[in-house]
């Protein structure tokens, strides 16, 4: 057989895949009615051709595609690891099958039309693997790439996936076509162009040609499609006609798919979540050899599930190795709760076939101790009609049939007929015994039942708004799956089992029906103080501000937990003691129709439970009064207020029914008991205390910060004061030195010629005014550095006496003025050829103008590079200087002056390179200018800026620029020396012009021409006396 199927593709392609991909369902052409391609490839072969490194085509890299373009191509799903959600899907622990089916997503739909070629549960939600279990097949072992089972499972519906992605609506329509018998054939095939269709056609061709080994595997045309004969002559499929007549003794129009499986499921424990669910219409049990190999279970390779760690757990088929009792019970409960609509669509007929005396749907739901009463109402009974009829109009009539059937499930399940029925009863008994120990109540009420049946898409409405507590689904759980779809409602028992199995992450968004919004599971656990799915008191609905509620509930529950635990234990013991009568009641309800039981049992039950109540009240602390425990419990157990007593009995799990009637009769569950009030008071008090503590802590912290800030400010202030003190002392010292110096200068006797001082001082005053702009520049720099109060104007130096003049100048202007006027003191002697008789104070009135002019020249000369005037003065001393003068010059160099380009460059570079910003840049520049040796320059820069490349580069550039600066200064100095000597000689000649003859006078006049200099060199013109200017112009 296998040899025939190896000839699918060309030799090279078979070699590529190791020839082992017989089991892969190859992709199909779009329309099955055309002639099929000669070459069809398996999934491994196609995966082998997938190139991961393919780049985005250039034409797609346009801006218009930027919004939809992804740089990384999506991998084939087979190569991607399964998500957490998909792993959970394998055990059908994640979504209610009914919800999936109603959404048109598959998950083992019991509708005849959906099962083609692979068994009824082959169609998987979103094309990502069976939602109930993992089918191990030969694919796994000898696939070309040896993919792990998870990955194979991931892509078992390789070609379904793309089609599902784009043809959902068609699939949904097609899913129902099976009901319409012959006429539905073509639509069915067109609705789903996937591997089943091409395989079925191929099998038919091969049957005609070779008498196929896969006899009867392909669906037949039209009416025959589900009624083809199996090799043993009996009806080969669990068709919804033959099988119903043959095995059920009554006819079902709805559940052909599942028909043949009742036996297997009944024995196997009926757990759709972990157990292998039957694969009709191929009739696995009867017709294994009538199916294609890839669709059959290997004898060695059974189906199974994955546990939380990802390990594969093989599960033998039900009839061969029944599952241990406890596991069975778990699974039974899980299936019933987790697939609410199974009450109609799976459990119903299955219940009819497999357990002919089923729990009615509502009881199935309540068999799990869960605080969510409406699973049954939601999807059960005519959920099929109400929910799916809207989604799938084409199948409306079939839905109506389903509706007629499913109340039958509740009311007349049919007479017990088979071995299955006895086993079903056994299972019910065992389950009842096991669940009797659980505390929660999930009773159903008729009003809720009908309301829920009329509510379409309750999942979404429940998710969007909080349901009232009286609503059946108010205490059930909803969650958002990773795709953002809301799943639910699920009972607490289901959620607890999935949580224990490790399916829920802490970030899963969950909510109860009565809560307003979704919250991460981790938050809910913190808020409740326990796992919310475990038995225990349930907090009130979370409405409004979630954060406040979260804190409140957390503390409230922590306080109530211990107290409630005791009540629960006592209650458990009391309930367990009434186990047998309740079991009997339950069986009665299961066997009979759902009419109210005869009056005596409810009355007895009521009396018994009233006795329970009295015993329970003895347990209560005195503070609470009669209703301390009961309202809280009734609220936490989500028992609705209304509802007839018989309702509770027939629909609830045994002890839960009793408990419900107990709470319903004596208490109105909507009243809030004193316990809750006390808890809330305690909680408020605790909150208030926490707020006070927090405020106190914040106040202390604030005080600490303020204290720290105050200390820092004081330190800062102290440092600033010290700096100011230092600066002030420095200035005082400079002032003293200047005064000394000036006093020494004044010690030279001044002839008391009455006419000489006025012109001299007038000239000086005029000069002071002309220097004002330079001084302002200097003062502005100093003001910026030291934030000193603005100095007084130098113009105040117009006092007729030089002492008054000195006192009138401000501190900084005095320094600057004296520094600028420095050449005055040594000026005459420098160029006077050693004539000690000619001092500043000895000049005649005539010479005053020339001297002042000489002074103006000096000042204007030194403005472009004032720093050089000092070195110029100290570099060529002609007369002796005292130590005070030298100190004064050094001090003056530290005072900011108008900067030349070189100094500015130095300061900018140092500011830039000083990483900490703590470097005293002006001081560093002054020192660098004084340091002669290049090595010393390098050392000093290294000490200031560190041994970095930038520092070395700066040192190098500094030396080069300084050399250029010095060269230009020397040239300037020579020129200035020559000019100053000429001006002094002119002044001398003008002073003694009366003694000279006319020839000498003209010679002197000619020499005065040398004073004429281009203003562009100095930056400004010289202001001498008007007579001098005339003498220049005369020439």
Swiss-Prot record:
The modification Phosphoserine is found at residues 24, 28, 137, 157, 230, 341, 406, 538, 638, 862. Residues 474-522 form the GYF domain. Residues 367-378, 406-417, 857-874 have a biased composition (Low complexity). GO terms for biological process: insulin-like growth factor receptor signaling pathway. Residues 148-179, 186-203, 239-267, 388-401, 696-722 have a biased composition (Basic and acidic residues). Residues 295-304, 324-349 have a biased composition (Acidic residues). Residues 629-639 have a biased composition (Polar residues). Residues 105-422, 621-640, 696-724, 825-879 are annotated as: Disordered. Transmembrane segments: none annotated. Pfam families: GYF (PF02213). Keywords: Phosphoprotein. GO terms for cellular component: cytosol; protein-containing complex. Interacts with GRB10. This transient binding is increased under IGF1 stimulation and leads to recruitment of GIGYF1/GRB10 complex to IGF1 receptor. Interacts with DDX6. The GYF domain interacts with GRB10. May act cooperatively with GRB10 to regulate tyrosine kinase receptor signaling. May increase IGF1 receptor phosphorylation under IGF1 stimulation as well as phosphorylation of IRS1 and SHC1. PANTHER family: GRB10 INTERACTING GYF PROTEIN, GRB10-INTERACTING GYF PROTEIN 1. This is GRB10-interacting GYF protein 1.
């Amino acid at each position: 057989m296998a040899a025939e199927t190896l000839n699918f593709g060309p030799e090279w392609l078979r070699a590529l895949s190791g020839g082992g991909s017989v089991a892969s369902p190859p992709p199909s052409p779009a329309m099955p009615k055309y002639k099929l391609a000669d070459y069809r490839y398996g999934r491994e072969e196609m995966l082998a051709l997938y190139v991961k490194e393919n780049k985005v085509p250039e034409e797609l890299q346009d801006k218009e595609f930027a919004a939809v373009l992804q740089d990384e191509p999506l991998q084939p799903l087979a190569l991607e690891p399964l998500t957490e959600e998909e792993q959970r899907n394998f055990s059908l622990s994640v979504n209610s099958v009914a919800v999936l089916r109603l959404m048109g997503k598959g998950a083992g739909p019991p509708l005849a039309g959906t099962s083609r070629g692979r068994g009824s549960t082959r169609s998987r939600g979103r094309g990502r693997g069976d939602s109930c279990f993992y089918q191990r097949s030969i694919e796994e072992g000898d696939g070309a790439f040896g993919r792990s089972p998870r990955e194979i499972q991931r892509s078992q519906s390789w070609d379904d996936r793309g089609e599902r992605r784009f043809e959902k609506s068609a699939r949904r329509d097609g899913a129902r076509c099976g009901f319409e018998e012959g006429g539905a054939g073509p639509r069915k095939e067109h609705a789903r162009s996937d591997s089943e269709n091409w395989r079925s056609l191929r099998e038919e061709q091969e049957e005609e040609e070779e008498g196929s080994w896969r006899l009867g595997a392909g669906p037949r045309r039209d009416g025959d499609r589900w009624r083809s004969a199996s090799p043993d002559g009996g009806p080969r499929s669990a068709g919804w006609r033959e099988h119903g007549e043959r095995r059920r003794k009554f006819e079902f129009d709805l559940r052909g798919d599942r028909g043949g499986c009742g036996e297997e499921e009944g024995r196997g424990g009926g757990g759709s979540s972990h157990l292998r669910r039957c694969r009709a219409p191929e009739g696995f049990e009867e017709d294994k050899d009538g199916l294609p190999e890839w669709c059959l279970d290997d004898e060695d390779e059974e189906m199974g599930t994955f546990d939380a760690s990802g390990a594969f757990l093989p599960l033998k088929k039900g009839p061969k190795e029944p599952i241990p009792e406890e596991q069975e019970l778990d699974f039974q409960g899980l299936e019933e709760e987790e697939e609410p609509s199974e009450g109609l669509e799976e459990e119903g007929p299955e219940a009819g076939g497999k357990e002919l005396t089923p729990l009615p749907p509502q009881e199935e739901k309540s068999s799990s101790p869960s605080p969510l009463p409406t699973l049954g109402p939601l999807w059960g009974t005519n959920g099929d009609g109400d929910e799916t009829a809207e989604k799938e109009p084409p199948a409306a009539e079939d839905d109506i049939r389903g509706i007629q059937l499913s109340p039958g499930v509740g009311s007349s399940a049919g007479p017990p007929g088979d071995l299955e029925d006895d086993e079903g009863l056994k299972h019910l008994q065992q389950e009842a015994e096991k669940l009797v120990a659980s505390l929660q109540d999930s009773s159903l009420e008729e009003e809720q039942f009908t309301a829920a049946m009329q509510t379409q898409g309750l999942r979404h409405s429940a998710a969007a708004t909080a349901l009232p507590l009286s609503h059946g689904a108010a205490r059930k759980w909803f969650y958002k799956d990773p795709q953002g779809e809301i799943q639910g409602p699920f009972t607490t028992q289901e959620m607890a089992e999935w949580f224990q199995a490790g399916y829920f992450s802490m970030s899963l968004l969950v909510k109860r029906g009565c809560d307003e919004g979704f919250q991460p599971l981790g938050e809910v656990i913190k808020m409740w103080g326990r796992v919310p799915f475990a038995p225990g008191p349930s907090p009130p609905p979370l409405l409004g501000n979630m954060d406040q509620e979260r804190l409140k509930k957390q503390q409230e529950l922590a306080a109530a937990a211990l107290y409630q635990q005791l009540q629960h234990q006592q209650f458990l013991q009391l309930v367990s003691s009434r186990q047998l009568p309740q079991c009997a009641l339950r069986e009665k309800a299961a066997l009979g129709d759902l009419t109210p039981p005869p009056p005596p049992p409810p009355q007895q039950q009521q009396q018994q439970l009233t006795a329970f109540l009295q015993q329970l009240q003895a347990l209560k602390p005195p503070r609470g009064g009669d209703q301390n425990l009961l309202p809280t419990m009734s609220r936490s157990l989500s028992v609705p207020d209304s509802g007839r007593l018989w309702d509770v009995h027939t629909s609830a799990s045994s002890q839960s029914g009793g408990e419900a009637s107990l709470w319903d009769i004596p208490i109105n569950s909507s009243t809030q008991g004193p316990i809750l009030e006390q808890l809330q008071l305690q909680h408020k008090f605790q909150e208030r205390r926490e707020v006070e503590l927090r405020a106190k802590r914040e106040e202390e912290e604030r005080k600490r910060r303020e204290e720290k800030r105050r200390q820092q400010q004081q330190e800062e202030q102290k440092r600033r004061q010290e700096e100011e003190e230092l600066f002030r002392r420095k200035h005082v010292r400079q002032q003293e030195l200047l005064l000394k110096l000036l006093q020494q200068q004044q010690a030279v006797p001044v002839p008391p010629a009455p006419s000489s001082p006025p012109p001299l001082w007038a000239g000086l005053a005029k000069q002071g005014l002309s220097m004002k702009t330079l001084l302002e520049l200097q003062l502005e720099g100093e003001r910026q550095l030291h934030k000193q109060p603005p100095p007084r104007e130098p113009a105040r130096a117009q006092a007729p006496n030089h002492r008054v003049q000195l006192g009138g100048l401000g501190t900084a202007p005095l320094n600057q003025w004296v520094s600028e006027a420095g050449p005055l003191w040594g000026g005459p002697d420098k160029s006077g050829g050693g004539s000690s008789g000619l001092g500043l104070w000895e000049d005649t009135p005539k010479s005053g103008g020339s001297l002042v002019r000489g002074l103006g020249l000096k000042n204007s000369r030194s403005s472009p590079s004032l720093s050089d005037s000092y070195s110029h003065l100290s570099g060529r001393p002609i007369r002796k200087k005292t130590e005070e003068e030298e100190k004064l010059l050094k001090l003056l160099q530290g005072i900011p002056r108008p900067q030349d380009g070189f100094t500015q460059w130095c300061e900018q570079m140092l500011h830039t390179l000083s990483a900490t910003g703590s470097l005293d840049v002006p001081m560093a520049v002054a020192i660098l200018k004084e340091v002669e040796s290049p090595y010393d320059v390098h050392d000093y820069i290294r000490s200031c800026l560190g041994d970095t490349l930038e520092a070395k580069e700066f040192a190098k550039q500094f030396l080069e620029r300084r050399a250029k600066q010095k060269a230009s200064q020397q040239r300037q100095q020579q020129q200035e020396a020559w000019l100053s000597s000429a001006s002094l000689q002119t002044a001398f000649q003008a002073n003694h012009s009366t003694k000279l003859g006319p020839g000498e006078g003209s010679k002197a006049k000619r020499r005065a021409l040398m004073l004429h200099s281009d203003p562009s060199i100095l930056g400004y013109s010289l202001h001498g006396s008007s007579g001098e200017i005339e003498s220049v112009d005369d020439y």
